[in-house]
A protein has these predicted regions:
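N-terminal intrinsically disordered, low-complexity, charged/polar
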Residues: 1-46
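Conserved phosphate-binding loops in nucleotide/dinucleotide-binding enzymes
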Residues: 18-22, 107-112, 121-123
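Single conserved hydrophobic/aromatic residue that forms the stacking wall/gate
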Residues: 133-142
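Conserved pre-motif C helix in the palm subdomain of viral-like polymerases
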Residues: 116, 121-131
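Non-transmembrane alpha-helical segments in soluble domains
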Residues: 31-34, 125, 136
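Long, intrinsically disordered, low-complexity Ser/Thr/Pro-rich regulatory/activation regions
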Residues: 4, 57-111
Length: 142
């Protein structure tokens, strides 16, 4: 994904959250979202712990299967079978490299951190804070 990159920022509940546009796709900073829940030095741990969860892997795998024709399903199945074990660890970088995932993006350097497509970022937000749940459709009457 080394192409045209542009960053902007939005404020969510008084917390600045970076949005990186890569090849005309917006990726929201999971790192910034995690910093809102914990101290800056532990944001990466929050993301890694979220990635370890079986429900997270199932969501990510389903998203990638739907939107990424180059997703490596066999590698995904391996991660899914390991999820839940005490010895299972997974970083965003490892997920991307092993499965050819496009929904998560890792950036080193000045705007470094872990970024995700808005669908994935909203899922992450709801996992770390119920007040960050996003309703993407208008509320329907009962």
């Amino acid at each position: 994904m080394e192409a045209t990159k542009k960053t902007t920022s939005i404020t969510v509940q008084d917390v600045p959250v970076t949005i990186m546009n890569v090849d005309q796709r917006d990726y929201i900073s999971l790192t910034d979202m995690a910093r809102a829940r914990t101290d800056a030095g532990r944001a990466a741990d929050v993301i890694k712990n979220w990635l370890r969860a079986r429900s997270t892997l199932e969501f990510l795998g389903t998203w990638e299967i739907m939107y990424n024709p180059n997703f490596k399903v066999v590698e995904f199945d391996h991660f899914k079978s390991e999820a839940g074990l005490h010895t299972f660890t997974l970083s965003a970088k490892e997920w991307i490299e092993k499965t050819n995932a496009v929904g998560i993006y890792v950036q080193a350097g000045r705007y470094g951190g872990t970024y995700a497509h808005k669908d994935i970022a909203f899922e992450f937000g709801s996992a770390i804070s119920l007040s960050l749940i996003h309703i993407s459709e208008p509320t329907r009457p009962y």
